From Swiss-Prot:
GO terms for biological process: alcohol biosynthetic process; isoprenoid biosynthetic process; mycotoxin biosynthetic process. It comes from the Eukaryota. PROSITE patterns: POLYPRENYL_SYNTHASE_1, POLYPRENYL_SYNTHASE_2. Gene3D superfamilies: Farnesyl Diphosphate Synthase. Geranylgeranyl pyrophosphate synthase; part of the gene cluster that mediates the biosynthesis of aphidicolin, a specific inhibitor of eukaryotic DNA synthesis and DNA polymerase alpha. The geranylgeranyl pyrophosphate synthase GGS is required for supplying a sufficient amount of geranylgeranyl diphosphate (GGDP), the general precursor of diterpenes. The diterpene synthase ACS then catalyzes the conversion of geranylgeranyl diphosphate to aphidicolan-16-beta-ol via the intermediate syn-copalyldiphosphate (syn-CDP). The lineage of its organism: Eukaryota, Fungi, Dikarya, Ascomycota, Pezizomycotina. It catalyses: isopentenyl diphosphate + dimethylallyl diphosphate = (2E)-geranyl diphosphate + diphosphate; isopentenyl diphosphate + (2E)-geranyl diphosphate = (2E,6E)-farnesyl diphosphate + diphosphate; isopentenyl diphosphate + (2E,6E)-farnesyl diphosphate = (2E,6E,10E)-geranylgeranyl diphosphate + diphosphate. Binds 3 Mg(2+) ions per subunit. This is Geranylgeranyl pyrophosphate synthase. Pathway: Mycotoxin biosynthesis.
Amino acid sequence: MAYTVEPREHSKNTTLPTVAMPPSPPSSFSASFGPFRYDTKEVNFDHWTSTKEKVVTGPYDYIAAKPGKEVRTLLLACFDEWLQVPPESLEVIGQVVRMLHTASLLIDDIQDNSELRRGKPVAQNIFGTALTINSANYVYFLALEKLNSLKNPNITDIFTEELLRLHRGQAMDLYWRDTLTCPTEEEYFEMVANMTGGLFWLMYRMMNAESSMPIDLLPVVELLGVIFQVLDDYKNLCSREYGKLKGFGEDLTEGKFSFPVIHSIRSNPEDLQLLHVLQQKSSNEHVKLYAIEIMESTGSLEYTKHVVENIVSQIQEIIYSTDEGQGRGKGILDLLHKITRLS
């Protein structure tokens, strides 16, 4: 059976009905209510205040309020013995490096599921993960904004290149942890040269760009990034002071392939116990002490000490040959002596 649609009969009156417009508000009507408050000629949408700014920077300010050992600030002064950067530029670079370092700690603590930072609860456990991530990202851009005051066209490129380097290194560290993949020592050194060395490179390259007497110390900068991370890995397992600030053996709880762990696993690949400990991500102190016993049995902690000594020797050799007796490397050598006391 076929269906047909009858055409609708149109009204002879095709005039559209008149729509009544709302009356204008009376003079007593508050400008804060009603649709008329959105008259863009009257409304100012830029109401950012210092109170709102504190909301954004709260997690960052929380960590920054209790500074660490300020090693990067000390290193800034060491590099300046060589580069003699103008004081105004040096101040900006120092502020930017501190901002980036502190902001990166906020992200690190989330990625590592940490509990303590500098002896205090981590920021995400106070402010929440989402606001903490936002705060860290915000400070990255505040740092970039601050660099614009240097009026140096090369600075932005340096900033971008070194933050890319840092995130590449961080990605590999996280990938190995999350896939339970033990890297080689060479892969580890490449990773830390990027991850830990990224901010060192950033600091040095910006100072070099602002200096009237630039000098090539990049091999020293790269080795400094490596030695700082190897030392951090060792102290995480063996330092009581470190344990009070970050928690005992936190790298084991995180499941991280730190330098002593890598050496131990590769020294005895048939023994899977240490891999299983990393997989469990245990916070049990007895389990972590047992893992350290395994590393001691493979000589991994002593091996780590020897590697540190070897890197120190390499840095000393480069500095002596570059300095030519002028004494500009004294600051770096003194700092190395201070931070490498492991016993």
